[in-house]
Amino acid sequence: MVNINELPENILLELFTHVPAPQLLRNCRLVCSLWRDLIDVMTLWKRKSLREGFVTKDRDEPVDDWKIFYILCSLQRNLLRNPCAEENLRSWRIDSNGGDEWKVESLPGDHGTSFPDTKVKKYFVTSYGMCLKSQMVDLKAEGYSEKLLDTVRPDIVVKDWFAPRADCGCTYHLRVQLASADYIVLASFEPPPVTIEQWNDASWQEISHTFSNYPPGVRHILFQHGGKDTQFWKGWYGPRVTNSSIIVSHRTAKNPAPARTLPEEDTSNRRKILSFGSWEDLSP
């Protein structure tokens, strides 16, 4: 009877390409030194990436670590739940519910335009008082280990889409923060509010930001957006938002700009997320 370890290494590698990654790393790698060494070979993880469609053979961009690349591709998905209002306001925390409060409408809506992606059918709409909603993403609960987050520090790509009504001006707000296990803010993206005047083209606009080279210790992501109309009209005339996303991805930028971080020596900037809508100073 032939021992499996007597098979040529290329045959063993081919067998391993069909074994799920968790079993390879948690079980197979512990069997013997031969299996451990083969499972650590980058060729195996490149083959698995090709087999599962994470990459094509004609890829020009180099990959530093195929195992990390494969793991990140396996986990990659939108970490925000109900981004397109298909489940009304489910999964969102309402931080501010001004005017006539948040509402869900179907595209294109009154005095609106179609969304670029035809699969998106609905949007959230704000009113004449400030409307803000948010989600908190727990990265460990989503499958990202502390070691992966702290040593690899993969890119965190945040995107949001917003649009005004053609007949009413509005102001749109976005805030995204990376926080530690105890909710200390380590990096943030909070662009100036976008104000759009009345009698506009009602077009959908995308806003995007990539967190790269952020400090170690990131465990949570706070995503908050919303706004209000600028004319204080009763009803739902404020900015419309939909198709929001947070995706953790393999770093692709060759020289990515570092994330905006809060310096440790500046204790006045060390803030803790107490709730999705309020902040507390942690300095003595």
Curated annotation (Swiss-Prot):
Annotated GO biological process: DNA repair; ERAD pathway; glycoprotein catabolic process; protein ubiquitination; response to unfolded protein; SCF-dependent proteasomal ubiquitin-dependent protein catabolic process; ubiquitin-dependent protein catabolic process
FBA domain boundaries: 69-250
Domain F-box: 1-48
Subcellular location: Cytoplasm
UniProt xrefs under SMART domains: FBA, FBOX
GO terms under cellular component: cytoplasm; endoplasmic reticulum quality control compartment; SCF ubiquitin ligase complex
Modified residues (Phosphoserine): S249, S268, S275, S278, S283
Top-rank taxon: Eukaryota
PROSITE patterns xref list: FBA (PS51114), FBOX (PS50181)
Chief location category: cytoplasm
SS bonds (residue pairs): none
Pathway the protein takes part in: Protein modification; protein ubiquitination
Annotated Pfam families: F-box-like (PF12937), FBA (PF04300)
Record key words, sorted: Cytoplasm, DNA damage, DNA repair, Phosphoprotein, Ubl conjugation pathway, Unfolded protein response
Quaternary structure, from the entry: Part of a SCF (SKP1-cullin-F-box) protein ligase complex. Interacts with VCP, CHEK1 and CUL1.
Function: Substrate-recognition component of some SCF (SKP1-CUL1-F-box protein)-type E3 ubiquitin ligase complexes. Involved in endoplasmic reticulum-associated degradation pathway (ERAD) for misfolded lumenal proteins by recognizing and binding sugar chains on unfolded glycoproteins that are retrotranslocated into the cytosol and promoting their ubiquitination and subsequent degradation. Able to recognize and bind denatured glycoproteins, which are modified with not only high-mannose but also complex-type oligosaccharides. Also recognizes sulfated glycans.
Official protein name in the record: F-box only protein 6
Organism: Rattus norvegicus
